[in-house]
Amino acid sequence: VHFLSLQIFGCGAVAQVTTSYDTKGQFLSINLAFAIGITFGVHIAHGISGAHLNPAVSLAFCLIGRFQWSKLPFYVLSQIIGAYLGAATVFAQYYDAIMSYGGGNLTVTGPTATAYIFATYPAAYLTTANGFVDQVVGTGALLLCLMALVDTRNSPAPKGLEPALVGTIVLVIGIAMGSNCGYAINPARDLGPRLFTYTAGWGLDVFTAGNYWCWVPLVAPLVGAILGCIIYLLFIEIHHSRKEDEKQTNERGNTEYDIDLDEWKPNKRNLTTLTASDKVHIINNPFQEGQSENSDWKKSSCNEECIVNRF
């Protein structure tokens, strides 16, 4: 459902602009449609999948230990299928317009090409190497910004505004980096529609066009996503100072607390900040070290067991 929203809005905008000969929208309207589609896609899917719409993001989060490897194949498959179905929906909606624009032909290149409505293709001047760099930079920028949005120690996104901010990231990437090859920055967003165009009648040209361009939007975003995560971890995240009762957000949006039982002063105010969906990581545990005479804990009506059992 979430990927359908992205493809229908984004590719639908490209179809409208293309088949109307730019009389019903321009490049900016395409960028806005993809950005708003991403916004609602994230909003729709956040509670179910953590809003994983992009295999590059999912893979990068697996590599840094913030997503489960066992889930990755199923997420990627669903993302590609969703993109395929989204492209099919746009084709069905704009079938007459596409056939009229192409003179009854489904072509990949030339003045009446329509394959780029669904998948990305390089500009005539773009080399494969330059296109690869373009996609690495664009996806790296995406991950760098996403990492900041979910970093609870670095002014994280206000609760409820995450979808809009993710959409804003996509918008600015499109405005700044969209002219070379359509800023796929997402392997599924390109592969799903490309597979659809192949099965719908555009033929093998969808894979061979642009000097076999099809592999670039599959591989380059993966490289860019990994680099974006590494850059954020090395230059930002590892420099955060760890604070008592530090909050960290896990993949489902719940809150995790690191509590040093040897130093933390339990009181009613502290305990009421914890909710049933939160998790506690016990560190420097005096109970396990035989230091159960800790006066602060003896005076408290709660101990380690009551905290752990609550969660």
For the regions a protein language model found, what residue spans apply to each?
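Membrane-interface helix-loop junctions and terminal tails of multi-pass membrane proteins
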Residues: 1-311
